[in-house]
Curated annotation (Swiss-Prot):
Major subcellular site: membrane
Gene Ontology cellular component terms for the protein in this record: external side of plasma membrane
SUPFAM superfamilies registered for this protein in UniProt: E set domains
Source organism (scientific name): Dictyostelium discoideum
Transmembrane spans: 846-866
Protein name: Tiger protein O1
Length: 887
């Protein structure tokens, strides 16, 4: 019984010892990149080292220093060479027994460099400390879904636990890794980045990286508007967005995927002109550009047009007007106005709101072209549209390849429309081409076997109008068919009603009820299997009268009355006046008005509605004179300006100077200039007249005074003197004087900034109040002399001239007195220098002589002492010798 009790006690003690040899659960670890410590509670076992077993190679032991005070703290400095070794397949410690270190006591890994794997996944670098404290092959991602990040080469002898590769799975956005000790690490995949944005007519292609695959939803916004998920497709490297922008504009695009936001990027929707017509080199004309985004998003139409600049080569095309989002017009001046303008391959530049097109479109003068898609055939009169069609006398027309003489050929002044009656011999297909100035156009084919004509009545803008069309060459199989008209832009179909009993079945008239509309409409007429093209033009607006009302010198209005059509279409109307397109703020069917503003001038006023223009009304605005400016005159003349308001190019004004009339130049509606190339220096009075003599006056041209800035260097011997400055005049009467006494002769004008003359030698008697002493305060070399330069009525005076002190040569007897004086001054200077030298010698001698005497005395004393010592020595030697001899 006692033995059994003893065994139980021993087993209990042994088990108790085992428990108390384990590390207390309250132990905790503190670590950073250079430090690792374990904190053990009071009465707990502790360890002073950790042992790391590796897959390959020897194990590594990390030793700690331990301090016991209110528990025990064991710590170790973690040096760079140690960081690479503290990892292992097994980590153990020993007290009285060896134990495996619990994962809760692993230090939390420290990631020291940014860790943002690509969304495609793949190889990334992980850097830090304690990253693989317990040697492993992967990290566990727990959010947003469970995935593994694999550690590469962890079993290799060359494995660096502070810097190694990991293989990441595809992912997106924020992720969470759970470390071995239970702590969490947040990281995110790379943010999306945009490298290239390509804008197409119907989509935007965004190329970049890290957009995440299609399994992750994205929020894409353009100017804050969310793009629906159904309107884009994406992968990690690109996004294709279905998007159409009709205007030239800068927009902001933001891409957000899985709560990761890219940098907001500006995308620019640039104008893209694709087609341009041609105009004659000698005339210029209206250019029509067609393409994409040919308008701004400005709601004010006037501001929209003000922000449009079109350049053909280096020429600015004036009065640019955005007709629609796809079309712009402007007026191009004749090419011969600028001799540097070439005929061909001029680049077209369209700038809207400071945004310029990038695509390449070239313009060529004088390209003869027929438009195959725009023609009409009323009553066998073929009406063609095109470019550079020439004139009725010079254009050659080819029908079916043969030159055809046409007596009724009509071509408008702009060379854009051509019409003629088709000769009777042509019955079916007609091939048409023209030749202008030996340039042959393209050839177009027209079916003339079936055509139509209509009455002169215009469809109304206010209501339905019956218009009678007569159809010709109707085929027999179509006799009983009901004809129809299709208004092409709106695709409105109107059926015709017969208006007469046919006497000839192949020619028949029908009435068509045309609905209210606006502008010119292309139509297609169909009967059975036959069709042809034609057009109808709605009511043409009429201007009866226009006047300027209520102008007080600053404000006023232009008011017009007439017949302007249906009020419902007036929103599509505008006024062309003074090279501007104006939207009248006040308008109804009979009246419109708009403000009179600076920049307007007398001009033809045209009202247009839906592209149909009224006949021009000549509106006269009395010009207003506000002032003149002749301040920009220089030595050779300059500009004279008449300033005011409402000037036109044909305003009558003139300037007379010295009974000569000078030609005006119209600058703009506020400025007229005159180039008065009248050389100075003598001021003159001129006369101007303005607005047919309603205002006259005199003005004086005052030329600037000359300004002397510098002269060349010259000595008293005289010689060529160059004078530099500004505002010199090329006149015969030029005078140059020094100190009001010495006159310069042989004066020569060089340019507006310099002249030369010969200055005679200096004569002392002329300067009776001065002495020619180089170092005297009264010498002519020590101060600047008065220089006078006169160009007829203009004089400059100033103390700027000074003689040079350079060596003076005896060139003639007139210089002897000067040279004698100079030599006298030099002799005086030499005497002064000698006197100064004597004084210096005396001072030096008084210092050196006593020193020399002291040196001699000292030397004598030294010699005397030496002699005495020798005498004494010789005496001592003699006495010794005597004693030796005695011995």
């Amino acid at each position: 019984m006692e033995k059994k009790l003893l065994i139980i006690v021993i087993v209990f003690l042994f088990s108790t010892i085992q428990v108390f040899c384990r590390i207390d659960d309250k132990t905790f670890v503190i670590s950073n990149e250079t430090y690792l410590s374990y904190h053990f509670p009071v009465d707990s076992e502790y360890f002073s080292s950790l042992n790391f077993e590796h897959y390959e190679g020897p194990s590594f032991q990390l030793d700690f220093e331990c301090i016991t005070f209110n528990g025990t703290i064991c710590f170790s400095q973690i040096y760079p060479e140690i960081k690479k070794k503290i990892y292992g397949t097994s980590i153990s410690y020993s007290t009285q027994k060896t134990y495996k270190l619990d994962q809760e006591l692993f230090p939390t890994p420290i990631v020291s460099s940014p860790f943002q794997p690509p969304t495609k996944g793949g190889i990334s670098i992980l850097k830090g400390t304690f990253l693989t404290f317990s040697e492993k092959t992967f990290y566990q991602v727990i959010y947003p879904k469970k995935q593994k990040i694999f550690i590469l080469d962890s079993e290799s002898l060359s494995f660096d636990a502070t810097n190694f590769k990991v293989n990441c799975p595809p992912g997106c956005g924020y992720q969470i890794i759970k470390w071995d000790n239970g702590n969490l690490f947040n990281f995110s995949y790379s943010n999306p980045s945009i490298s290239v944005v390509k804008i197409n007519p119907s989509n935007i292609i965004v190329n970049g990286s890290d957009f995440c695959d299609s399994s992750y939803s994205s929020n894409i916004t353009i100017d804050g508007v969310i793009i629906p998920n159904s309107n884009y497709e994406k992968d990690e490297d690109s996004i294709v967005i279905i998007y159409t922008q009709q205007h030239t504009i800068k927009s902001l695009m933001k891409i957000e995927t899985s709560n990761v936001t890219s940098v907001e990027i500006e995308i620019v929707f640039k104008p893209e002109p694709l087609l341009i017509n041609s105009v004659p080199y000698s005339k210029g004309g209206l250019l029509i550009l067609e393409g994409l985004r040919l308008s701004s998003n400005t709601t004010n139409k006037n501001n929209n047009n003000n922000n449009i600049i079109i350049k053909i080569g280096n020429i600015t095309c004036s009065n640019a007007i955005s007709i629609s989002n796809d079309s712009i017009t402007c007026n191009l001046n004749p090419g011969f106005n600028n001799k540097s303008v070439t005929l061909n391959n001029l680049p077209v530049s369209v700038t809207i709101n400071n945004i310029t097109n990038e695509n390449k479109l070239l313009f060529n003068y004088g390209i003869v072209k027929l438009n195959p898609n725009k023609y009409s055939l009323p009553d066998r009169v073929l009406q063609l549209n095109g470019d550079c069609l020439g004139n009725s006398n010079g254009t050659i027309v080819y029908l079916n390849g043969k030159e055809t003489l046409l007596n009724d050929l009509k071509i408008n002044n702009q060379e854009t429309t051509l019409s003629f009656k088709i000769p009777d011999e042509f019955k079916s297909k007609l091939n048409v081409s023209i030749k202008v100035n030996d340039i042959l156009s393209n050839e177009i084919q027209i079916d003339i076997s079936f055509y139509a004509s209509h009455s002169n009545e215009q469809p109304s803008t206010n209501g339905n109008t019956n218009i009678i069309f007569t159809l010709y060459n109707i085929k027999s199989e179509n006799y009983n068919k009901i004809p129809s008209i299709i208004i092409i832009p709106e695709q409105i179909v109107i059926n015709g009603v017969s208006v007469n009993s046919p006497t000839n079945q192949d020619v028949h008239s029908y009435s068509f009820l045309i609905p209210a509309g606006c502008g010119k409409k292309d139509i297609q007429i169909i009967i059975g299997s036959q069709s042809c093209l034609s057009s109808i033009t709605y009511f043409e607006p009429i201007i009866k009268n226009c006047l300027v009302s209520g102008f007080d010198g600053t404000n006023g209005n232009i008011i017009c009355d007439g017949s302007f059509g249906n009020k419902d279409y007036l929103i599509k109307s505008s006024v062309l006046f003074s090279n501007d397109e104006i939207i009248p703020p006040s308008i109804n069917s009979t009246t419109f008005s708009f403000p009179l503003i600076s920049g307007y001038h007398s001009d033809d006023l045209i009202f247009q509605m839906c592209g149909v223009q009224s006949k021009p009304f000549k509106l006269n605005i009395s010009p207003s004179l506000k002032g003149i400016n002749q301040s920009q005159m220089e030595t050779l003349g300059g500009k004279f300006y008449i300033l005011g308001e409402f000037f036109s190019a044909n305003i009558n004004c003139s300037v007379f100077c010295n009974d000569k009339e000078y030609e005006k130049k119209f600058e703009n509606s506020k400025t007229i200039s005159f180039d008065l190339q009248i050389p100075g220096p003598n001021d003159i009075t001129c006369n101007y007249t303005f607005d047919n003599g309603k205002n006259t006056g005199d003005f004086k041209i005052e030329y600037p005074l000359p300004l002397i800035e510098n002269t060349s260097s010259i000595n008293v011997n005289g010689g060529n003197l160059t004078i530099y400055g500004k505002n010199f005049y090329n006149v015969s009467n030029i005078k140059v004087e020094v100190d009001n006494q010495l006159k310069c002769n042989k004066i020569e004008f060089i340019n507006l900034n310099s002249l030369t003359c010969f200055l005679p030698p200096f004569i002392e008697t002329l300067f009776n109040d001065q002495k020619l002493l180089l170092n005297s305060s009264t010498t002519i070399f020590s101060k600047k002399l008065l220089l006078n330069v006169t160009f007829e009525s203009k004089t400059w005076s100033g103390y700027i001239f000074q003689y040079s002190k350079e060596e003076i040569k005896n060139n003639d007897t007139s210089e002897n007195s000067t040279n004698d004086i100079l030599n006298h001054e030099k002799n005086n200077n030499n005497q002064k220098d000698g006197s100064s030298l004597s004084k210096k010698s005396i001072i030096l001698l008084s210092i050196l002589l006593p020193s020399f005497i002291i040196l001699i005395v000292s030397l004598a004393i030294v010699i005397l002492v030496i002699k005495r010592n020798k005498t004494k020595h010789s005496k001592n030697m003699s006495s010794k010798e005597k004693e030796l001899m005695k011995q």
